[in-house]
């Protein structure tokens, strides 16, 4: 899996730059230039991944589009408000960290049990969040768990990629078809989500700060350790 510290930090930084604009332009600019194109790119990348899996579900064929989908997710993974929160989608897309290896154990159990009901998009959507999404696929693309049951692993990759694409498209549609307007119309009569423009701006800042803290404390901080316990 190829991830860099720079790519993890740049996405929240893009939101910071947008929110540093004049007060009347910051929220619209963030929505128009960061969030909407970011989720559109993620939906497109996951759709490409699912399309590839439908014709060739081998790890070798799927690693490049999986990496592209992961890169696209990093651009929006810190924006959890609205459609990404619904149904726990963000957690199902990227359940990490998983210190107890819940996802790994569940994946092994699925490969051993080979339940045909699970290798459909509908079946995959009912799985635990620990076994779904980008990290569920990573185990089937880079680990040796698939050796237990290669044919079932292939079908499971197809189901998980289709499930991932469905979640990405639902989030994109949720922003385009309503939630973007909810954010942009903050303070307007009838907007019960954000009672003022300041509330919407604060919500985006909160997402930004949470994303930066997660990168610093978990993605970077955990591998580095502390001065006393490196």
Question: Where are these predicted regions, by residue range?
Answer:
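Sec/Tat signal peptide C-region and signal peptidase I cleavage site
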Residues: 19-25
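Bacterial N-terminal signal peptides
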Residues: 7-18
């Amino acid at each position: 899996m190829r991830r860099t510290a720079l790519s993890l930090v740049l996405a929240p930084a893009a939101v910071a730059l947008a929110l540093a604009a004049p007060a009347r332009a910051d929220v619209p600019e963030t929505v128009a230039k960061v969030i909407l194109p970011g989720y559109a790119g993620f939906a497109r990348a996951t759709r490409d991944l699912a399309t590839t899996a439908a014709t060739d579900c081998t790890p070798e064929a799927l690693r490049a589009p999986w990496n592209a989908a992961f890169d696209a997710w990093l651009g929006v993974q810190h924006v959890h408000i609205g459609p990404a929160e619904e149904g726990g989608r963000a957690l199902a897309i990227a359940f990490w960290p998983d210190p107890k290896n819940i996802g790994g154990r569940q994946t092994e159990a699925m490969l051993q049990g080979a339940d045909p009901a699970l290798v459909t998009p509908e079946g995959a959507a009912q799985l635990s969040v620990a076994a779904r999404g980008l990290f569920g696929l990573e185990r089937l693309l880079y680990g040796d768990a698939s050796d237990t049951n290669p044919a079932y692993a292939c079908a499971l990759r197809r189901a998980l990629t289709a499930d991932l694409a469905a979640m990405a498209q639902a989030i994109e549609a949720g922003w385009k078809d309503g939630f973007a307007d909810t954010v942009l119309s903050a303070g307007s009569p009838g907007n019960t989500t954000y009672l003022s423009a300041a509330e919407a701006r604060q919500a985006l800042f909160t997402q930004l700060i949470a994303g930066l803290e997660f990168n610093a404390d978990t993605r970077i901080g955990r591998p580095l350790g502390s001065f006393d316990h490196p």
